[in-house]
Amino acid sequence: MDLFKLFSGKPSSKEVAKDRLKLILIHDRSSIAPELLEVMKSDILKVISKYVIIDDDEVEVRLTKTEEVDASSPALIASIPIKKMKQR
Protein backbone atom coordinates (compact mmCIF):
# COMPACT_ATOMS: atom_id res chain seq x y z
CA MET A 1 0.00 0.00 0.00
CA ASP A 2 1.34 3.41 -0.97
CA LEU A 3 0.66 5.80 1.93
CA PHE A 4 1.58 8.83 -0.16
CA LYS A 5 -1.23 8.09 -2.62
CA LEU A 6 -3.63 7.48 0.24
CA PHE A 7 -3.10 10.95 1.74
CA SER A 8 -2.29 12.98 -1.39
CA GLY A 9 -5.92 13.38 -2.39
CA LYS A 10 -5.09 12.99 -6.07
CA PRO A 11 -7.19 10.46 -7.97
CA SER A 12 -5.43 7.49 -9.51
CA SER A 13 -5.14 7.21 -13.27
CA LYS A 14 -7.73 4.43 -13.08
CA GLU A 15 -10.23 6.78 -11.44
CA VAL A 16 -9.49 9.55 -13.95
CA ALA A 17 -10.03 7.16 -16.87
CA LYS A 18 -13.26 5.89 -15.30
CA ASP A 19 -14.56 9.45 -14.87
CA ARG A 20 -13.66 10.34 -18.46
CA LEU A 21 -15.50 7.28 -19.76
CA LYS A 22 -18.57 8.23 -17.71
CA LEU A 23 -18.49 11.73 -19.21
CA ILE A 24 -18.24 10.36 -22.74
CA LEU A 25 -21.23 8.10 -22.14
CA ILE A 26 -23.25 10.92 -20.63
CA HIS A 27 -22.44 13.20 -23.58
CA ASP A 28 -23.49 10.50 -26.03
CA ARG A 29 -26.75 9.79 -24.22
CA SER A 30 -27.69 13.43 -23.71
CA SER A 31 -27.17 14.37 -27.37
CA ILE A 32 -25.36 17.58 -26.40
CA ALA A 33 -22.32 18.05 -28.60
CA PRO A 34 -19.01 18.82 -26.85
CA GLU A 35 -18.74 21.97 -28.96
CA LEU A 36 -22.09 23.19 -27.59
CA LEU A 37 -20.93 22.45 -24.05
CA GLU A 38 -17.83 24.61 -24.64
CA VAL A 39 -19.97 27.47 -25.98
CA MET A 40 -22.26 27.19 -22.95
CA LYS A 41 -19.23 27.22 -20.64
CA SER A 42 -17.85 30.31 -22.34
CA ASP A 43 -21.18 32.15 -22.09
CA ILE A 44 -21.62 31.23 -18.42
CA LEU A 45 -18.11 32.46 -17.59
CA LYS A 46 -18.69 35.75 -19.44
CA VAL A 47 -21.79 36.48 -17.37
CA ILE A 48 -20.24 35.48 -14.05
CA SER A 49 -17.10 37.50 -14.82
CA LYS A 50 -19.20 40.67 -14.85
CA TYR A 51 -19.67 40.31 -11.09
CA VAL A 52 -16.69 38.38 -9.74
CA ILE A 53 -13.05 37.63 -10.54
CA ILE A 54 -12.75 33.91 -11.19
CA ASP A 55 -9.85 31.47 -11.34
CA ASP A 56 -9.97 30.47 -15.03
CA ASP A 57 -7.46 27.65 -14.57
CA GLU A 58 -9.62 25.86 -12.01
CA VAL A 59 -13.02 26.16 -13.74
CA GLU A 60 -14.75 22.85 -14.32
CA VAL A 61 -18.01 22.51 -16.24
CA ARG A 62 -19.31 19.04 -16.91
CA LEU A 63 -22.42 17.24 -17.94
CA THR A 64 -23.78 14.54 -15.67
CA LYS A 65 -27.10 12.88 -15.06
CA THR A 66 -29.60 13.24 -12.27
CA GLU A 67 -30.91 10.23 -10.44
CA GLU A 68 -34.67 10.66 -10.49
CA VAL A 69 -37.24 8.06 -9.54
CA ASP A 70 -38.75 7.59 -12.98
CA ALA A 71 -35.79 8.43 -15.23
CA SER A 72 -32.49 10.21 -15.35
CA SER A 73 -31.96 13.49 -17.14
CA PRO A 74 -28.84 15.45 -17.99
CA ALA A 75 -27.58 18.07 -15.53
CA LEU A 76 -24.91 20.72 -16.04
CA ILE A 77 -22.52 20.96 -13.08
CA ALA A 78 -20.18 23.94 -12.78
CA SER A 79 -17.38 24.45 -10.28
CA ILE A 80 -16.15 28.04 -10.64
CA PRO A 81 -13.68 29.20 -7.98
CA ILE A 82 -14.20 32.86 -7.10
CA LYS A 83 -11.10 34.92 -6.27
CA LYS A 84 -12.98 38.03 -5.18
CA MET A 85 -16.06 40.15 -5.79
CA LYS A 86 -15.86 43.08 -8.19
CA GLN A 87 -16.80 46.52 -6.94
CA ARG A 88 -19.98 47.88 -8.48
UniProtKB/Swiss-Prot annotation:
Keyword Flavoprotein attributed: no
UniProt-listed SUPFAM superfamilies: Cell division protein MinE topological specificity domain
Coiled-coil positions: none
InterPro entries the record matches: MinE, MinE_sf
Keyword Cell cycle attributed: yes
One of the GO biological process terms: regulation of division septum assembly
Keywords: Cell cycle, Cell division
NCBIfam families the UniProt entry points to: minE, PRK00296.1
Family stated for the protein in its record: Belongs to the MinE family.
Biological role stated in the UniProt entry: Prevents the cell division inhibition by proteins MinC and MinD at internal division sites while permitting inhibition at polar sites. This ensures cell division at the proper site by restricting the formation of a division septum at the midpoint of the long axis of the cell.
Name of the protein in its database record: Cell division topological specificity factor
Gene source species: Clostridium novyi (strain NT)
Taxonomic placement: Bacteria, Bacillati, Bacillota, Clostridia, Eubacteriales
